Amino acid sequence: MTAASPADEHAMRLALDQAHNAWLVGEVPVGAVILREGKVVATGYNRPITTHDPTAHAEIVALRHAAELLSNYRLPECELYVTLEPCAMCAMALMHARFKRVVFGAPDPKTGAAGSVLDLFAVEALNHHTELVGGVLAEPCGDLLRGFFTERRAERLAERLAERRADRLADRSALGRAGLAELAGDEDAPAPIPTGEATELPADSLLPPT
């Protein structure tokens, strides 16, 4: 990996803006920006959930936009900035597109393919090698992801608690209905007195005079 520059940090902040957009629509907050000669060509953020497309990672979304705009699937003059270390799918797509440089923010210890789990960018047998920079604004990039998942866990916990409360209320209601049904089937049980109506009781049910 090579060192980052102030220009890299500026571009990564643009990618962070895209990551915030992903959060707003309920997606895992990962954002990407593609630059050519220092100018923004395309942007993208995670969209697998909203598009029902498992390949719609931020890098792929931005890559598709750039390729369409530039009318070329090869982008050798372009650099891509992404807030999370690329997975194997994205890493290979970026190399197939012949990107000059890839810069990422936070490492991904579960699926990262730029050094965390494996490093596809370092495989010498591949026919194209892309310059790689990692850890640019890693802390804010990671904080955004941690905040998102903390919020998601809290929401799921609240949903489970609400479901349990609803189940308890339903159980109590069912027990109450069962009790009324049991009384209704008891021949010796007195008939319920309608609310707001006077009812004359049978003579044999009256208390003897004192």
Question: What function would you assign to each model-found segment?
Answer:
Residues 15, 19-22, 32, 42, ...:
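Small-residue (primarily alanine) positions within well-ordered alpha-helices
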Residues 72-84:
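Immediate flanking context of iron-sulfur cluster ligation sites
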Residues 41-48:
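Short beta->alpha transition motifs characteristic of CBS
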Residues 1-22, 92-210:
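Zinc-dependent deaminase
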Residues 30-38:
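Short beta-strand scaffold segments in enzyme catalytic cores
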Residues 50-61:
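A short, polar/charged loop-to-alpha-helix boundary motif
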Residues 2, 48-49:
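A short, polar/acidic, helix/strand-boundary loop motif
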